[in-house]
Amino acid sequence: MRKYEIMYIIRPDIEEEAQTALIERFNTILTDNGAEIDKVDEKGKRRLAYEINDYRDGYYVIINFRGSEEAINEFDRLAKFNDDIIRHMAIKDEQ
């Protein structure tokens, strides 16, 4: 299994309970597809470098995990259809 890092930004006007549920849901998507989560780092609300979908701020979440491409592909597929996630990106951790 390779190491990966996923960073995603949640829209800032979502309720805190819904935000927590969203983070748990996407963590579960990874683990259900065979990934082992090492660390979930919630960076909090930050200003975006540029406006995305009329939002100037966003709630940043970074997940470090070990897993396969299938886990990333499923995360990517579901994140694209979720209106609460305004941007996401996955990279391979070379460490």
From Swiss-Prot:
Gene Ontology CC: one annotated term: ribonucleoprotein complex
Gene3D superfamilies (UniProt xref): 3.30.70.60
Entry keywords, A to Z: Ribonucleoprotein, Ribosomal protein, RNA-binding, rRNA-binding
One Gene Ontology term from the biological process aspect of the record: translation
Listed GO MF terms: small ribosomal subunit rRNA binding; structural constituent of ribosome
Similarity remark: Belongs to the bacterial ribosomal protein bS6 family.
Known function: Binds together with bS18 to 16S ribosomal RNA.
Protein name, entry field: Small ribosomal subunit protein bS6
Gene name of this polypeptide: rpsF
